[in-house]
Curated annotation (Swiss-Prot):
Signal sequence range: 1-19
InterPro entries: Calcineurin-like_PHP_ApaH, Metallo-depent_PP-like, MPP_PAP, Purple_acid_Pase-like_N, Purple_acid_Pase_N, Purple_acid_PPase_C_dom
GO cellular component labels: chloroplast; chloroplast envelope; endosome; extracellular region; Golgi apparatus; mitochondrial envelope; mitochondrion; trans-Golgi network
Binding-site residues for Fe cation, renumbered to this chain: D306, Y309, H485
The encoding gene: PAP2
Cofactor remark from the record: Binds 1 Fe cation per subunit.
Record's keyword annotation contains Cytoplasm: no
Protein name in the entry: Probable inactive purple acid phosphatase 2
Gene3D superfamilies on file: 3.60.21.10, Purple acid phosphatase-like, N-terminal
Cofactor requirement: Fe cation; Zn(2+)
Domain of life: Eukaryota
Length: 656
């Protein structure tokens, strides 16, 4: 009996001790994903005395030190976390290296107030590792091409395609007018950049740097105007991408469609060292809807600075390109440089008046990822003065249908006497207005804004002094800017003044509302600088904090820009510019986005559904107004078809 009792006592103690010493476990399913965007489920159990500060870290490459995670999630996002077990599902991007996942215990007493992320939240501690998963792989491996995006070249019957793969083995594009017969091919040039090319931390630190893979660049040639082409990139030995398609550019087209915005960034399914942009998901979603509605009409996208907001954390570029691939692989994706791609402490051009303007917003990238991951038309470049390769894609232009598009850099020298100024001058003076009656200039930092961006006051003054006379003299139709994360439309303006009659004054729009959610306040009233009193100046015709993008539609007679809001995908502001010089201010009245397959560029945007009687009544009223307006316009413009004078019909609106 005594022996039996001792046996059971020993068994009880051993079971108790075993239970007390049990370790947390973590598993993943599946252990291999096919492509970027596929999801993995991470499950854990055995977490004793769980805390709402316990967290899950994502690591790639898998041998990364504990504090070199790419992102994290708190375990309390699972509904069962208090019971010591749970699961989280995460869509992941192929970083050309395996992932692993680790669970940590973290307590309030271990919070380091000096160790914070971009939002000033304390970064989680890594002192107590509870469990680590097996490695997660991508079935496509490092060789499969991803991050596919298109752009125009200097030749009108071509289309550039760029993509990323994990090794430098030769890749190709094959293309044709049928997805079943990709009979044309071209070899792609591979290139890469190294950690030593970065100019500061975090880009050149062990935390921010990740291998960017190989960037491939090739051109599809001898394209027929306005024809849909199918293509895929890759190689027989490493694998081919899915088949994508696009509509070739037609410079003689009678209609132009473009989707334009700035400061979009990207979203990540985890929290990381820097702020990411959840609103960018909606921006991409609505633009994809509009592209699909176009059918076989060509279009393009213009992203005017602050592209990914990686700011030195390399993998954020991968997240960005994975997010935009559905649209960037279908229409050309054009960019200009912003402060968050470029600015660094030793940048070559930093005059005394700009010492407080050009800081370290590039996170040590000094324009390198931007310069190599994109290849825009033209050959503009500036030396960085360091090991980094020259900064490219600074200023360039091209025609698309009825519009001449110009891109400029506000981060490098734009003053008189500089190479960029001379390019802008020559380019604007050489535009054939019979071929392209409308000219659209785009840059990152705005020439005009009514936000309280006092730091950029001097650069705005310099832009007005040096660039605005070129815009006015050469009858620029529209100037688009980002940097301020709001939408704002100005009257046709020159020297901060608008009246009733001008000669060629451009309309300025700030369109930095595509994703970044840090928003400055509007300019307060001078005698109440510390109170939320924000009068809207007369020059500002419409402004809002709503996220979204702009849609440009132009034919030979009219260019229309509409602001589409992300919360409903509908138009919230519209402005029309006629080839004759007349500018018609729009309204904040929300209108449904037309089906671009069937609605011509000149069509009036239809409002929300209403009764037939009311619709016909409004229609009759519009016809009367249209006749009167046509008579007035005809009276003042008869015999003066070449006049560039602008007449502005103002309607002033604001959304807050």
């Amino acid at each position: 009996m005594i022996v039996n009792f001792s046996f059971f006592l020993l068994l009880f103690v051993s079971v108790f001790v075993s239970s007390a010493d049990s370790k947390a476990t973590i598993s993943i399913s599946p252990n291999a994903l096919n492509r970027s965007g596929d999801s993995v489920v991470i499950q854990w159990s055995g977490v004793d005395s769980p805390s709402d500060l316990d967290w899950l870290g994502l690591y790639s490459p898998p041998e990364s030190p504990n504090d070199h995670f790419i992102g994290y999630k708190f375990l309390n996002e699972s509904s069962t976390w208090k019971d010591g077990f749970g699961s989280i599902s995460l869509p992941l991007t192929n970083l050309r290296s395996n992932y692993t996942f680790r669970i940590f215990r973290w307590s309030e007493s271990e919070i380091d107030p000096k160790h914070k992320d971009h939002d000033q939240n304390p970064l989680p501690g890594t002192k107590h590792l509870l469990a680590e998963s097996e490695q997660l792989t991508f079935g496509s491996g490092v060789g499969m091409p991803e991050q596919i995006h298109l752009s125009f070249t200097n030749m009108v019957n071509t289309m550039r395609v760029m993509f990323v793969a994990g090794d430098g083995e030769e890749r190709f594009v094959r293309y044709g007018e049928s997805k079943d017969l990709l009979g044309n091919s071209a070899a792609a040039r591979g290139m890469r950049y190294e950690r030593e090319h970065m100019c500061d931390s975090p880009a050149n630190s062990t935390i921010g740097w990740r291998d960017p893979g190989w960037i491939f660049d090739t051109v599809m040639k001898n394209l027929n105007d306005g024809v849909r082409y199918y293509y895929q990139v890759g190689s027989d030995s490493k694998g081919w991408s899915e088949i994508h398609s696009y509509i070739a550019r037609d410079v003689t087209a009678e209609e132009t469609v473009a989707f334009m915005f700035g400061d979009m960034g990207c979203a990540t399914p985890y929290t990381t060292f820097i702020r990411t942009q959840d609103e960018s998901i909606s921006t991409v979603k609505w633009i994809l809807r509009d592209i699909e509605a176009l059918g076989d009409k060509p279009a393009m996208i213009s992203h005017i600075g602050d592209i990914s907001y990686a700011r030195g954390y390399s993998w954020v570029w991968d997240e960005f390109f994975a997010q935009v691939e559905p649209i960037a692989s279908t229409v050309p994706y054009h960019v200009c440089i912003g402060n968050h791609e470029y600015d660094f402490s030793t940048q070559p051009w930093k005059p005394d008046w700009a010492a407080s303007i050009y800081g370290n917003d590039g996170g040590g990238e000094c324009g390198v990822p931007y310069s190599l991951k994109f290849n825009m038309p033209g050959n503009s470049s500036e030396s960085t003065g360091m090991k980094a390769p020259p900064t490219r894609n600074l200023y360039y232009s091209y025609d698309m249908g009825t519009v001449h598009f110009v891109y400029i850099s506000t981060e490098t020298n734009f003053l008189k006497g500089g190479s960029q100024y001379e390019f802008i001058k020559r380019d604007l003076e050489s535009v054939d207005r019979k071929k392209t009656p409308f000219v659209v200039v785009q840059g990152h930092r705005p020439m005009y804004t009514t936000s309280n961006e006092v730091r950029d006051t001097m650069i705005r003054q310099k832009m007005v002094e040096h660039l605005e006379p070129l815009f006015v003299k050469n009858n620029v139709t529209l100037a688009l800017w980002g940097h301020v994360h709001r939408y704002e439309r100005f009257c046709p303006i020159s020297n901060n003044t608008c009246g009733t009659q001008w000669q060629g004054n451009p309309v300025h729009l700030v369109i930095g509302m595509a994703g970044q959610d840090w928003q400055p306040i509007w300019q307060p009233r001078p005698n109440h600088p510390d109170l939320p009193i924000f009068p809207q100046p007369e020059q500002s015709m419409y402004r809002t904090g709503e996220f979204g993008y702009t849609r440009l539609v132009a034919n030979k007679e009219k260019l229309t820009v509409s602001f589409v809001g992300n919360h409903d995908g509908e138009v919230h502001d519209t402005v029309e510019m006629l080839a004759s010089g007349v500018v018609i201010s729009g309204s904040k009245e929300s209108t449904k986005i037309p089906n671009l397959k069937t609605v011509p560029a000149s069509a009036t945007l239809m409002g929300k559904s209403e009764s037939n009687a009311l619709w016909y009544a409004k229609g009759a009223g519009l016809m009367v107004v249209g006749v009167l307006l046509g008579f007035i316009i005809g009276f003042f413009t008869r015999g003066k078809k070449s006049s560039s004078g602008n007449r502005w019909i103002p309607v002033k609106n604001e959304e807050t």
